[in-house]
């Protein structure tokens, strides 16, 4: 069996100004080029660009890759971090069209599944933008998020995942 070194939850500067109404407009200052360079440096095989409420950044990354051979070995797939009407977030992998934000969680999940996408509950117990128990509606569950500002959020996610026998990822 072989393993793929994969980044499942990351943003670039195209995520800016696409966040929810109650969130600050600035999310990330990493350019597409810098993100690709960092991915090569980390020896990644796969990258899912999960910008907030947009596929921008993914599209630009594909274009940049086409013009720069050194990134050809890195596989890049479409994804989006969608904001619900309650300002919680859902990761959606493998979509071809953006999913509209500010919908209910169930509406977002239906839209994702209509595209054959996989859904993930990111940072499910963070202090803000978390799905909490509604995470059970998603396909996968993020037990570690490097951006959580407290150590308890990841630990609580890990315990919750074990109690509910969830399939987990780290982002």
How should these model regions be labeled?
Residues 1-86:
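An N-terminally biased module of ancient metal coordination in phosphate/nucleic-acid-related enzymes
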Residues 88-91:
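Active-site segment of extracytoplasmic enzymes that catalyze sulfate/phosphate-ester chemistry
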Residues 6, 10-26, 58, 94-171:
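Domain-core and long-helix interface of multi-subunit machines
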């Amino acid at each position: 069996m072989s393993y793929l070194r994969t980044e499942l939850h990351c943003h670039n500067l195209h995520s800016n100004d696409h966040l929810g109404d109650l969130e600050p407009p600035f999310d990330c200052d990493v350019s597409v080029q810098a993100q690709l360079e960092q991915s090569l440096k980390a020896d990644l095989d796969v990258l899912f660009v999960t910008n907030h409420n947009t596929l921008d950044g993914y599209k630009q990354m594909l274009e940049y890759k086409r013009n720069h051979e050194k990134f050809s070995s890195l596989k890049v797939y479409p994804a989006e971090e969608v904001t619900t009407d309650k300002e919680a977030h859902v990761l959606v992998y493998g979509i071809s069209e953006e999913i509209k934000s500010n919908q209910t969680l169930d509406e977002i999940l239906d839209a994702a599944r209509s595209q054959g996408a996989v859904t993930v509950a990111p940072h499910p117990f963070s202090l803000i933008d978390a799905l909490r128990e509604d995470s059970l509606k998603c396909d996968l569950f993020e037990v570690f998020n490097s951006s959580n500002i407290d150590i308890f959020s990841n630990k609580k996610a890990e315990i919750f995942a074990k109690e509910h026998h969830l399939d987990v990822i780290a982002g």
